[in-house]
């Protein structure tokens, strides 16, 4: 029969079992890079002073992993230029885009794991007519022609 001489003799075995659980690092959110044309801004953006929000817009992908697909993309505080975001989302959202205009071609870095990066309000005027499509969150937005 197995007997323990001291309670401390279990510590090395316990440490070996629990250590992998303690050091699991959170994996970075996977990203998707696409070139897409902004085809629909369904309404007016709320005022930034009211609350922090992400606003869903519709794009037609013209390059990258999802070529020729129509996608819905949430942008954090779209009234602001991407470089002017200065709150706690500055470390998440970037790019050189100054404003969102229908017809503009954008280079976007997206994540399909929106709730991992944004847990706040989402203004989604597509929700009533399209509940099935995935909503992507934009991490970086630039004009595709670099202007």
Locate the predicted segments by residue.
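Intrinsically disordered and other compositionally biased segments
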Residues: 7-10, 45, 84
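Disulfide-stabilized netrin-like
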Residues: 53-57, 62-146
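Sec/Tat signal peptide C-region and signal peptidase I cleavage site
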Residues: 21-25
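Structural detector for short beta-strands of small beta-barrel domains
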Residues: 30-49, 55-58
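N-terminal secretory signal peptides that target proteins for export/translocation
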Residues: 1-6
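Bacterial N-terminal signal peptides
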Residues: 9-20
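Generic marker of residues within folded, mature protein domains
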Residues: 15, 26-28, 49
């Amino acid at each position: 029969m197995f007997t323990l001489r001291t309670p401390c003799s279990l510590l090395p075995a316990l440490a070996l079992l629990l250590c992998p659980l303690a050091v699991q690092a959170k994996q970075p959110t996977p990203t998707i890079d696409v070139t897409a044309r902004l085809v629909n801004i369904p309404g007016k953006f709320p005022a930034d002073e009211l609350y922090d929000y992400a606003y869903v817009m519709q794009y037609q992908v013209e390059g990258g992993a999802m070529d020729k697909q129509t996608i819905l993309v949430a942008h954090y505080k779209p009234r602001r230029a991407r470089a002017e975001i200065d709150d706690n989302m500055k470390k998440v959202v970037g790019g050189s885009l100054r404003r969102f205009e229908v017809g503009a071609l954008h280079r976007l870095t997206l994540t399909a794991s929106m709730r991992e990066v944004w847990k706040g309000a989402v203004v989604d005027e597509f929700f009533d007519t399209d509940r099935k499509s995935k909503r992507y969150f934009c991490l970086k937005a630039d004009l595709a022609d670099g202007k």
